[in-house]
From Swiss-Prot:
Lineage: Eukaryota, Viridiplantae, Streptophyta, Embryophyta, Tracheophyta
Compartments in which it is found: Plastid, Chloroplast
Metal-binding as UniProt keyword: no
Reaction it catalyzes: RNA(n) + a ribonucleoside 5'-triphosphate = RNA(n+1) + diphosphate
Coiled coil segments of this chain: none
Pfam family, one: RNA_pol_Rpb2_2
Official protein name in the record: DNA-directed RNA polymerase subunit beta
InterPro entries found in the cross-reference section: DNA-dir_RNA_pol_bsu_ext_1_sf (IPR042107), DNA-dir_RNA_pol_su2 (IPR015712), DNA-dir_RNAP_su2_dom (IPR007120), DNA-dir_RNAP_su2_hyb_sf (IPR037033), RNA_pol_bsu_bac (IPR010243), RNA_pol_bsu_CS (IPR007121), RNA_pol_Rpb2_2 (IPR007642), RNA_pol_Rpb2_2_sf (IPR037034)
Amino acid sequence: MLGDGKEGTSTIPGFNQIQFEGFYRFIDQGLIEELSKFPKIEDIDHEIEFQLFVETYQLVEPLIKERDAVYESLTYSSELYVSAGLIWKTSRNMQEQRIFIGNIPLMNSLGTSIVNGIYRIVINQILQSPGIYYQSELDHNGISVYTGTIISDWGGRLELEIDKKARIWARVSRKQKISILVLSSAMGSNLREILENVCYPEIFLSFLTDKEKKKIGSKENAILEFYQQFSCVGGDPIFSESLCKELQKKFFHQRCELGRIGRRNINWRLNLNIPQNNIFLLPRDILAAADHLIGMKFGMGTLDDMNHLKNKRIRSVADLLQDQLGLALARLENVVKGTISGAIRHKLIPTPQNLVTSTPLTTTYESFFGLHPLSQVLDRTNPLTQIVHGRKLSYLGPGGLTGRTANFRIRDIHPSHYGRICPIDTSEGINVGLIGSLSIHARIGDWGSLESPFYELFEKSKKARIRMLFLSPSQDEYYMIAAGNSLALNRGIQEEQAVPARYRQEFLTIAWEEVHLRSIFPFQYFSIGASLIPFIEHNDANRALMSSNMQRQAVPLSRSEKCIVGTGLERQVALDSGVPAIAEHEGKILYTDTEKIIFSGNGDTLSIPLIMYQRSNKNTCMHQKPQVRRGKCIKKGQILADGAATVGGELALGKNILVAYMPWEGYNFEDAVLISECLVYGDIYTSFHIRKYEIQTHVTTQGPERITKEIPHLEGRLLRNLDKNGIVMLGSWVETGDILVGKLTPQVAKESSYAPEDRLLRAILGIQVSTSKETCLKLPIGGRGRVIDVRWVQKKGGSSYNPEIIRVYISQKREIKVGDKVAGRHGNKGIISKILPRQDMPYLQDGRPVDMVFNPLGVPSRMNVGQIFECSLGLAGSLLDRHYRIAPFDERYEQEASRKLVFSELYEASKQTANPWVFEPEYPGKSRIFDGRTGDPFEQPVIIGKPYILKLIHQVDDKIHGRSSGHYALVTQQPLRGRSKQGGQRVGEMEVWALEGFGVAHILQEMLTYKSDHIRARQEVLGTTIVGGTIPKPDDAPESFRLLVRELRSLALELNHFLVSEKNFQINRKEV
């Protein structure tokens, strides 16, 4: 429980702070801890000893910059050097050298790592904390069975259970169980020590039979009995040293290593005082656990709630990186042992430098960042996405749960999540509730627990002296914590007498005098995504969840705009995302253009390079625009350049546009959206997308591949954009099918393909004629655009394993179009159904046409009323030229506070602009509007306003797909599935029913056979369709029917088919 130095003040912590703290903990503690575990290594004859001197380790600053590492596809890492000594025991000589152990990827200012030029982030994992947990469940007779589960640091489990005769068993696996007396004896206790150390010796004596006495007569007997049960070995095994080692390795190391967290938890739960450095399970722990289990059976003690956060721990970046370092050093130990024995065998004199290789450490970290489930590619769709990704918490991953096995109780919200894990922000689908998001003020404590801050209120005044504390989930159970209207930002506001509070997982109403702690901030319980939703208190939680997910999918627009109605967190999100360029100290601007800003300060002249049209991994465009003029004096922390989706250092994901909630000719049925052509021609929702196309050159068996402009058999039109080297020129406009990189792959032609005169010449002159196949990089369908960058990455060596890579970056300008997805900040999403001319759109009483028409039926059933408040307040803000930043739950000040604020602002706007239609008392917030086609007013008044609408990354250009013919699956001979594989549509059950309903038998037969999986017929269909002939009817079965026949044959069922002519069919029917 830690206090903050300043009394009564709190600031929002940096949103990347958790990642930084984790990495700092690894560098400061974890690195030394793992290096100090590295053992002294001796040779077989015990003549040479190798050891590391940990105190002198050194991490060297990287030689390359972050930006160069991304550009050249390298890893941004630091070299680790440690002093190592080699001691000759006979002569007592020691040779000490500073050796290079390997590279450790560093964390950059965004809280991410750059591995092979790709931004990667390690997310935090929630695991069951090591310790002991007591639970009860009903058996088939309805009787409670009590169990105590000991969870080790590795996740291994040992279960203690008590049966109806009060006998205690240790369950080693699902099938095997042994008596607790045998387990204690195998761990080194004799019967007298067992009985002295338990509270209920008579119960232990009650199940001590003669057979049991024989088993625990000596430690050897107990170990043999335990080994038999654990390894399921028949017969009579013989006690040996190797048997003990196997048991130690397979059982005690995996299931009995508690770690420091487990030791602390077991000491606390069982009231023991075993030293913290004793991290293995002791016989004393087993006996104390058995005593507690007996107490449980007789109604003493409390059961554990496995889903409470006090029984969970966070496995942070530090723990994961430390585990990988331990793994790498274990591999290094084996390498050193092998090298020492090899050197002695070949009579070579080893040196520390020769014994150690950097491969184990470097490859371990590269494979960790590349393959581990908790190391993910950073999602960089927009600035918000980058920050939110680093604050995720996952129950999945190694040692955790899976989406299929996790039950509903684990996924559900728990009262202990309050202020630590956001109750709203989680993924949708199979992982719902398993991937959460950290609350704004939560932090990870030293013991892996999630801590949340509170103000401590002192008894006398409850206001005068206030101190901030960080409490873990096990600590805040014992305090009355005020919530609700005690969250007043201004402490001068008179607190009410009765306040809602939380105590021991329950929500109560208590007197203000009884409160011990109070929350520090209205947003304290929410994640960043949920905290950016204005009026979130008026929305259903499901819609708030969708909104916090959809804000992460918003595309940065070419001209961004601040939201009129926000929550006040927009600035902090933008600053912490690292997207805007910020002045590190004060100075004066000397020069500025689109590529760099030069300013002088502290006697130095600094040049800040700006990001120019950089591609994110979601193909969005990252670009910085300078915001300062030449000659201007700037202060430390001032914004020098805005990035993608930021304006004036504030997050700006969408646009404030004029919206009407009304039906319009059915074009906004089922969440469809009607928009005005102004949004297209005015470039309101225009965004830039950058696609990357790459090609590699290999050295084949016939020779190296060549990059060239001279490509035979191709039209000159397709090669028009290539330079003399065969690579597309910068700035050229390319269309589908154009060649981006010309490449020839050598191949030797078959003898039969040569003309007779060629063969004669080859026989006489001995010339080997080589032909080449064109393997050019062509622009695929939908890729048209402007070439903005070409990178030729030449790897060292140039072998076939390190091929040269050429990357071409093409920028596309995309206006909004029919089929694109748009969304508000309240889970109100829709697809553009029609783009109307501006003169046909409904228009306001001052003649302005609206930009977008939403369906009003999308509001009541979904209970996201916050959008109506935002819509009306946005209209008032645009007329008054004001921006609003509203904290959630403003009803804590007075009832209907949101409605009063909106109406008062609308009233003021109508007064100041002399437009009475802005606020009409008969139907406040609504206005009469006119049909643009006829000029007649609509029957009912309509809600109009200016909400903040986002354009999402689900765009029709990436989804629309057509195919005439393409690839087929080998087994079924049916078209492949999906756009990426150039797949076809599947006519499924329901589609067949629809066609049957219309009675189109011939079309149905064509779809299911000729056009689908009849190999010969589908080729004929294509030909006859082109020339306009009739489709020939095949007389054999399609491939899927033949597949069915083969599968039946595999079950020894023969199926014959033959043709029955119509004539014979009639005769046979008469005979029947």
